[in-house]
């Protein structure tokens, strides 16, 4: 790429990041959705990676950048300057988290200001970024980015452990991979990665897992398109360990999208009779694509349906096992979805708990006597996890809690809770229930 083209691409990357961030901050949009929509328009994989890295860095460091802007700007930027404010934060992230060469970060960000149609503000952007370069950024509390109601709830639920949650949730999560051991072992895949110059490790607990030292685009993963590897956090991979399944068991994945857990179960148990549901038909299409990539010779029954509305999808034949990966607050995956802290509201938890209870009741009806239901969330809130399960056990005479080992996390009522960063995995809750014969 010629120098002029490289410079133009650098400006376009900063501009794309600013527009994504403005949509997240000021329009309440999902970071994941905005990245999915914007990144295909960025041609170079390195520029796509830069856009993504800037966005994540800004969201993780937003409290410090907000303080810096209040201190360094003569007057606050008006709401109409949302993209300009986001661009300044994108510049901060390049100097702070990403540690890019200052001349490149400043030049491209100032030019992006002009590309925004704000040439008169280019001098201000340059001056603020140079001050950031000289002075660094204000120190803020580890919990500064968390809504006050959520800070209080986590401290009430977990005491001193909450402080570690705040710290770990601000860190970058490692990239975990899952391999189908029937085709390739984790050790063999680590060797394949090494041939590509990618350093990775197997895991002593997770039998199908590989963890990268540094994240890479999936396009760089050998055999990804052929189903030799998938991206899946270690906590999510343990779902397959928790369910003891007969070879041809009838299994329901009640909230299946995007399909990683369904695909993992099929890799482990090729003869499973798997039914996968999701209330969103577009997300269910992702399940189909995931299974088609990883297990093209397997048959899965897909239903775009609300699992709680059994009359709409269930044929009355009971399942041997049910996986209910319930909709939740996502408070255990803030390091992967930092915009959760912007968008989550206290009254969301009431609605989520009610939905989880309805799903538990409905899925339980579809389970045969002697069958198992695995309830999981990526939440850290007791109301969604151990309190939810304890209430279900109290009102459900034929439900019995089954023990899970310490490899699933800390004892939490009838289940197990992992906190973010433990075993380098995401925050996650597991509860295994047996339906009495």
Swiss-Prot record:
Q: Into which EC class is this enzyme placed? A: transferase
- Transferase as a keyword of this entry, yes or no, is yes
Task: Please give the GO cellular component terms listed in this UniProt entry.
Answer: cytosol
Active-site residues from the entry = 378
InterPro entries, per the entry: MeTrfase_RsmB-F_NOP2_cat, MeTrfase_RsmB-F_NOP2_dom, NusB-like_sf, NusB_RsmB_TIM44, RCMT, rRNA_ssu_MeTfrase_B, RsmB-like_ferredoxin, RsmB/NOL1/NOP2-like_CS
UniProt-listed GO biological process terms: regulation of DNA-templated transcription; rRNA base methylation
What is the species of this protein?
Answer: Xanthomonas campestris pv. campestris (strain ATCC 33913 / DSM 3586 / NCPPB 528 / LMG 568 / P 25)
Q: Name the gene behind this protein.
A: rsmB
- What reaction does this enzyme carry out catalytically? cytidine(967) in 16S rRNA + S-adenosyl-L-methionine = 5-methylcytidine(967) in 16S rRNA + S-adenosyl-L-homocysteine + H(+)
Enzyme Commission number, as recorded:
2.1.1.176
Positions with a binding annotation for S-adenosyl-L-methionine: 255-261, 278, 306, 325
Family, as annotated: Belongs to the class I-like SAM-binding methyltransferase superfamily. RsmB/NOP family.
Question: How is this protein named in the record?
Answer: Ribosomal RNA small subunit methyltransferase B
Location(s) in or outside the cell:
Cytoplasm
Keywords, alphabetical: Cytoplasm, Methyltransferase, Ribosome biogenesis, RNA-binding, rRNA processing, S-adenosyl-L-methionine, Transferase
Under Gene Ontology molecular function, one entry of this record is: RNA binding
